[in-house]
């Protein structure tokens, strides 16, 4: 979790923390603990690969007994997905004015983005791009209307789904006129960022969920020409839910408790901690192992 003003012991919170958006804290280098944006990136807190870590009481959430551990372990990334989709759908109890969305990437975040849209009863069309067949299958189960593989006919496939038209310039990738009303880039690579801009309808919105680093070869002319809105989606905070502000984590837990979202097939591999090498390999080579989310079982100290 983000290390905002409250965690840092700062009495007068910055304007972002004051509104509950601790992921955008202005004071990540000051306060009672060392500099760092999140747990795991601060020497005073340690992180998930340490023998132990430190958490502030505001970062602790009670998981209801009727939510299984395999679902609870996904509350944090589900919160990130919920935070992201509201940038497009707005207040989730209002009828969506976004007819179509494209989700690029069907790893954990892409699949959870689809699940989150389905959980809030998004009434538009969801098209996803999945690299592996097992990801495509799960994307459809979670609510995607159509899933495409990133092959040589990708542009033609997406144009046929969105009613757009592609034109091949003398140099470079195709130009797309029309497209999806909103695109969620859940990969964040140079190629996917460039494609996201091209696949999005004029005056549409691109939400960057995957960490983009320093992209190369992205044609920003598309942003200018199509007047696109491009926004990042980092972590979580406070959201407008049923016309009231709620912490994203609490909302995610409530959706799971009410069975509004089924993540039972997201955790595909469970390992004891002692088998960490095989666990890491399974997580890295997704296509070979047909893995989605790989987790450790720490419930039995004898096997951990």
Question: What function would you assign to each model-found segment?
Answer:
Residues 1-60:
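Glycine-rich phosphate/adenylate-binding loop and adjacent beta-alpha elements
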Residues 98-106, 118-191:
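Adenosine-nucleotide cofactor-binding segment
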């Amino acid at each position: 979790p983000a290390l905002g003003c409250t965690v840092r012991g700062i009495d007068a919170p910055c304007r972002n923390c004051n509104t509950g958006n601790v992921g955008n804290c202005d004071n990540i280098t000051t306060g009672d603990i060392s500099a760092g944006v999140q747990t795991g990136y601060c020497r005073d807190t340690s992180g998930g690969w340490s023998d132990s870590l430190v958490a502030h009481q505001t970062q602790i959430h009670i998981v209801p007994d009727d939510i299984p551990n395999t679902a609870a372990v996904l509350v944090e990334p589900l919160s990130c997905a919920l935070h992201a989709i509201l940038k497009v759908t707005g207040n989730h109890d209002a009828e969506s004015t976004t007819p179509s969305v494209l989700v690029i990437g069907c790893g954990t975040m892409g699949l959870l983005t689809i699940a989150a849209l389905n959980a809030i009863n998004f009434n538009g069309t969801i098209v996803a791009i999945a690299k592996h067949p097992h990801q495509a299958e799960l994307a459809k189960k979670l609510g995607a209307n159509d899933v495409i593989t990133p092959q040589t006919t990708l542009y033609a496939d997406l144009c046929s789904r969105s009613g757009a038209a592609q034109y091949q310039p003398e140099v470079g990738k195709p130009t797309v006129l029309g497209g999806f009303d909103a695109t969620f880039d859940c990969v964040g690579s140079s190629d996917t960022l460039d494609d996201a801009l091209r696949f999005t309808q004029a005056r549409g919105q691109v939400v960057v969920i995957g960490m983009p680093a320093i992209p190369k070869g992205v044609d920003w002319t598309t942003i200018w020409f199509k007047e696109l809105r491009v926004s990042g989606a980092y972590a979580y905070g406070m959201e407008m839910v049923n016309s009231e502000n709620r912490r994203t984590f609490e909302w995610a837990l409530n959706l799971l408790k009410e069975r509004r979202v089924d993540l039972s097939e997201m955790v595909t591999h469970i390992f004891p901690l002692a088998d960490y090498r095989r666990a890491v390999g399974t997580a890295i080579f997704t296509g070979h192992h047909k893995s989605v989310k790989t987790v450790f079982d720490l419930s039995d100290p004898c096997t951990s």
